[in-house]
Amino acid sequence: NIVLNELDWWIASQWENMPTRKNREYARSDNGVIDKSQKYEMLRKSSALKECYIVRYADDFKIFCRKRSDAVKLFAATRDWLKERLGLDISPEKSRIVNLKRQYSDFLGFKLRAVRKGVKSNGTAKYAVESHMSDKAVKKVKRQTREMVKRIQSPANVNEEYKAIGAYNAYVSGVHNYYRCATHISKDIRKIAFGITRTMQNR
C-alpha cells in the first residue's frame, strides 16, 4: 500500500494536481471542501492534458478517463511506469479498458457504469454513475444468508438459536452498511430478500 501511494501521486500529478499559473482552487463556504472545477475547466480548454482520476483500495484500482484514446495511452503509460518505477507487473487477466457507457465494470464488490442524465447547458450529454452490488457479491450474499437462515431454523438448542439470529442480524447490517453508497442498492437488496423469503417459506 505504501508503495502504491506513489502511483496515486503520479496519476494525480497528470491532472488533478497539475499546477496552473493562477490558483483556481477554492474552499466551498458550505462544507469547506476544496473545489477544483474552475481549474479543471481551464485545463480542458487550454491544455492537451489527459483528464484522469484514480480510485484505489490496497492493490486494486481503477483509473477513469473521459475518452477511449486517453484511456489507451494512459493504460500503456501506467503499465510502463509500474514496471520501471516500482518493478511491478499488472495482471493481463484483470487489467483492461472498459467503456462505462456500454457495460459495467466491477470494483470492490460493486459494479459501475455511466448512464445518460439529461443535457448540459452547452448541449452535450450529461452522465452520472449508476452503481449496484456486483453479480458475484449478490451470489455470495444470497448463499451466506441462506446458510444462516438454515441455522436459525434448525438450531441444536435455544442458545444456538439466539447465536444464529445474532449472527444473521450482524451480517445483514454489515451488508447494508458496506453497500449503502450504491445508487441502486435498494433494488439489489429487494431481489436478495425475495430469494431469502422463499427459502424460509419452503423450509
Which ranges hold each PLM region?
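Non-catalytic terminal/accessory segments
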Residues: 1-203
